[in-house]
C-alpha cells in the first residue's frame, strides 16, 4: 500500500531537475501520484475503508495545489509533467 524506498528513489531520479534534487514540485507531484495510484488499487479490494479514503482526498488536494503552482509558473513544464504522469489537466 505504501511506496517503497526503491520506487521513491526511482521517481526522484526520473523527475529531478538536478542530481541532488529531491524537493522540486515535479518530484513531489510524481511521488504524490504514485501514492494516489497505490491507494486507488487498495480501494478496489477494500471499498469500506473510509479513513484511508479521506487520506486519499487530502493527497489529491495537495497534488492539485502543486500542479496549480507549476501551471502558474511554467505552463510548458506543467503540460510535460501531466503527460508523463498520465493525469488530466486542471480546469
UniProtKB/Swiss-Prot annotation:
Keywords: Ribonucleoprotein, Ribosomal protein, RNA-binding, rRNA-binding. GO terms for cellular component: cytosolic small ribosomal subunit. The keyword NADP does not apply. Gene3D superfamilies: 6.10.250.3130, S15/NS1, RNA-binding (1.10.287.10). The keyword RNA-binding applies. It comes from the Bacteria. Part of the 30S ribosomal subunit. Forms a bridge to the 50S subunit in the 70S ribosome, contacting the 23S rRNA. This is Small ribosomal subunit protein uS15. It comes from Rickettsia massiliae (strain Mtu5). The gene is rpsO.
Amino acid at each position: 500500500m505504501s511506496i517503497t524506498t526503491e520506487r521513491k528513489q526511482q521517481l526522484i531520479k526520473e523527475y529531478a531537475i538536478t542530481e541532488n534534487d529531491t524537493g522540486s514540485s515535479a518530484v513531489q507531484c510524481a511521488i504524490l501520484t504514485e501514492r494516489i495510484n497505490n491507494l486507488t488499487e487498495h480501494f478496489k479490494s477494500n471499498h469500506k475503508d473510509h479513513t484511508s479514503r479521506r487520506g486519499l482526498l487530502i493527497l489529491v488536494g495537495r497534488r492539485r495545489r502543486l500542479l496549480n503552482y507549476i501551471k502558474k509558473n511554467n505552463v510548458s513544464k506543467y503540460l510535460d509533467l501531466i503527460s508523463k504522469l498520465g493525469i488530466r489537466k486542471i480546469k
